[in-house]
A protein has these predicted regions:
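A short Gly-Trp-Pro
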Residues: 1-9, 14-162
Length: 162
């Protein structure tokens, strides 16, 4: 695991954060929700433990969004410019879906998978050789063992603390 610290921020710079280490896994999500929420063709989300994202300036506010599943989806945005910085799903604040393009080095982490490609815009060309899923995927089959162990440790820690 990388102990590299990277910084990121919202569009206006009112919220700044540090990312401690690499994401467990990176999604390029082509679902309609991500398209509408970002105003783009897809969202690039790095899944990482909440405790590895350190906000050191400003404070993003969660905006609750409806989902098909019925589970809450909170998008954390800058209150000044409304840039989305990360999400959590189902109230799992211990797991962040960090918008990697908000990093000062947005190309630091390439997507591991492209998901919800059933709603991919027709003019988006996927790189040759990437793993592609029309919907979601089986984490146990796709995630590296180290990432699965990190996920389990974060989940267990969150469960133990209430």
């Amino acid at each position: 695991m990388s102990d590299t610290i990277r910084s990121g921020q919202c569009f206006c710079g009112a919220v700044r954060y540090r990312l401690h280490g690499a994401p467990m896994f990176v999604h390029c999500c082509h679902c309609r929700d991500c398209q509408k929420q970002t105003g783009g063709a897809f969202a690039v989300n790095g899944l990482i433990e909440g405790e590895r994202v350190e906000v050191f300036q400003g404070e993003p506010q969660p905006i609750r969004m409806a989902t098909e599943s019925g589970y809450p989806h909170d998008i954390y945005r800058c209150t000044a410019c409304q840039s989305p910085l990360w999400s959590d799903y189902g109230g799992r604040t211990w797991l962040r879906f960090l918008r990697l393009v908000t990093l000062d080095e947005p190309g630091a982490f390439a997507p591991d998978v492209h998901i919800y490609t059933r709603s991919k815009l027709p003019w988006v060309a996927l790189p040759e050789g990437v793993r592609v899923f029309e919907e979601y995927y089986d984490v146990r089959k796709e995630w590296p063992a180290e990432s699965q162990a990190r996920y389990k440790a974060a989940k267990d820690k969150a469960s133990a603390s209430g």
